[in-house]
UniProtKB/Swiss-Prot annotation:
Pfam families: Ribosomal_L30. GO terms for cellular component: cytosolic large ribosomal subunit. Gene3D superfamilies: Ribosomal protein L30, ferredoxin-like fold domain. PANTHER family: LARGE RIBOSOMAL SUBUNIT PROTEIN UL30M, MITOCHONDRIAL RIBOSOMAL PROTEIN L30. GO terms for biological process: translation. The gene is rpmD. This is Large ribosomal subunit protein uL30. It comes from the Bacteria.
Length: 59
């Protein structure tokens, strides 16, 4: 299964609680933190919810 490298590039300060929870569920914490996740429809949906906060690359 393909992997995605997800990096949090924008701060969560002032963001709605729902977006904060999605970022935490992806495994991200502070700005510039990076995590690798399997490419699945569930992860893609989570990325779409916070696309303006993260950068996604194929790993």
């Amino acid at each position: 299964m393909a992997k995605l490298k997800i990096t949090l590039v924008r701060s969560l300060i002032g963001r709605p609680e729902a977006q904060r929870k999605v970022v935490r569920a992806l495994g991200l914490g502070k700005t510039n933190s990076m995590v690798e996740q399997n490419d699945s429809p569930i992860i893609r949906g989570m990325i779409n919810k916070v696309a303006h906060l993260v950068k996604v690359e194929e790993a």
